[in-house]
Swiss-Prot record:
UniProt subunit comment: Interacts with proteasome 26S subunit ATPases.
Function in brief: Inhibits proteasome 26S assembly and activity by impairing the association of the 19S regulatory complex with the 20S core.
Species for this entry: Dictyostelium discoideum (Social amoeba)
SMART domains with a match to the protein in the record: WD40
Protein name: Probable proteasomal ATPase-associated factor 1
WD repeat ranges per the UniProt record: 101-140, 143-182, 185-224, 299-341, 345-382
Gene that this polypeptide is encoded by: paaf1
Gene3D superfamilies referenced in this protein's UniProt entry, alphabetically: YVTN repeat-like/Quinoprotein amine dehydrogenase
Keyword Amino-acid biosynthesis: no
Length: 425
């Protein structure tokens, strides 16, 4: 079934940004930086901030044009900024880890579920496993060629999955630093991968327009799930999604077909993919059937638009897609005929949509990153940006990870930015 829409409710999300290195004010008796309030896409209020050291533990921040800045006395990396009845919590990195002496550019990163180990991939085809506490390198993983665009841990925290522009995926022992297997089958660079259950099976997506279901123990392809004419940019595997989708949306059911004995945990799972062609697709992992293709037709248009979707996610009853023009579309998974909402805070591409911490005080919230260096926490009940992670100066966010009340950001440089004690997660 192909979905479309003629009218989509639109909400612009105002936000405040402050100079990326604002926290350096604490190292000087006085300092100046800039602050900006984006009221909508065309109107921005620019202000300047002057900081003054009162004593060893207290600083005063003064500004113009209606800005009010309130530093957190218990956490110098946190400051609240207000303007025009709008308020946002902004965090600076607690620490910044510079990898390989600043000689490498980070293209991807993952963190273990306990937050003790991290792994980053770079443009030279290598990955390095490091301790998140001090940045000490534990293992170097060498075997890819070209940019490593995927780096993630399995739930055990002992196994790493990587994918590169060389079209291959690799499974690594994070402790020993050895490559356990290589998955070969794509003919374009790897863009995304999602584990099925605990990780006996996985789904990979590529610039070749295909998504594949793999059996990891045998390094073999179980099924070719999709074949598009342009790249697949992101993927997400959801559980229990099929229970909410009307049965009429599923076509050409293969329920009577014999299930491949290599499949583990695919029953009840749905794959969501974000396509360069400008749509999302939902695919039943067990039957391999497409459940729905979620297109966007703007009011007054006669055909679907072709703006690329770069990111996708499933949150509560929402299927969410972020596109190349900065729009974030929401579908109700019980009705995929059309998006029920479009949010926007930038014209830059949306690159990541992630769940908030499972222990969050703000349950109905998601993290979103963009190509101009923004990393925001969105409160979906209020349609409001409530938290911002500073530290990247208008460059693309290449990876975002959240573990507990900690977050990790990377850009196209050699710095891993680590944030701690975030209030809203």
């Amino acid at each position: 079934m192909t979905s479309n829409t003629t009218e989509i409710p639109y909400h612009f999300l105002p936000y405040v940004r402050i100079q990326y290195d604002w926290q350096l004010a604490y190292k000087q008796d006085s300092d100046n930086c800039w602050v900006a309030y984006q009221k909508d896409l065309k109107n921005t209020i620019h202000g300047s901030v002057h900081s003054t050291k009162i004593d060893e533990n207290n600083f005063k921040f003064e500004s113009d044009y209606g800005f009010k800045l309130t530093p957190n006395k218990e956490n110098k990396n946190n400051i609240r900024v207000e303007n025009d009845k709008y308020s946002i919590e902004i965090y600076a990195p607690e620490k910044q880890l510079k990898v390989s002496g600043g000689k490498k550019r980070i293209t991807s990163m993952g963190v273990s579920h306990l937050g003790e180990l991290g792994v980053y991939g770079s443009t030279d085809g290598t990955l390095e496993v490091f301790e998140t506490g001090d940045g000490q390198i534990r293992r170097k993983l060498d075997g890819h060629v070209g940019d490593v665009d995927l780096a993630m841990f399995f739930p055990s925290g002992r196994v790493i999955l990587s994918g590169s522009s060389d079209s291959r995926l690799k499974i690594w022992d994070a402790i020993e630093g050895t490559c356990a297997s290589t998955l070969v089958g794509h003919i374009g660079g790897i863009t995304s991968a999602s584990l099925v259950d605990r990780g006996r099976n996985l789904v990979s997506c590529s610039r070749d327009g295909t998504s594949k279901l793999w059996d990891i123990p045998t390094s073999s392809i179980i099924s070719n799930l999709t074949k598009l004419s342009r790249p697949i940019n992101d993927s997400f595997i959801a559980s229990s999604l099929l229970d909410s989708i009307p049965t009429t949306t599923t076509t050409n059911s293969n329920d009577n077909n014999k299930v491949d004995e290599r499949e583990v945990g695919t029953d009840g799972k749905t794959l969501i993919i974000a396509a360069e062609e400008g749509f999302l697709q939902a695919i039943d992992l067990r039957s391999k059937n497409m459940i729905s293709q979620m297109n966007v037709v703007q009011s007054g248009e006669k055909s679907t638009r072709s703006v690329a979707f770069n990111a996708c996610h499933v949150h509560k009853n929402y299927i969410i897609g972020g596109d190349h023009n900065g729009s974030i579309y929401f579908w109700d998974k019980r009705n995929l005929n059309s998006p029920f909402c479009r949010l926007q805070f930038t014209n830059s591409p949306i690159h990541h949509i992630k769940a908030n911490s499972s222990n969050s005080k703000i349950a109905n919230s998601i993290w979103v990153t963009s190509g101009d260096g923004c990393c925001f926490l969105l409160d979906l009940d209020k349609n409001q940006i409530i938290t911002s992670l500073s530290g990247i100066d208008t460059d693309v966010v290449t990876s975002f990870n959240i573990v507990g009340n900690q977050a990790y950001l990377t850009s196209r440089d050699s710095i891993i930015r680590c944030y701690n004690n975030l209030l809203n997660i």
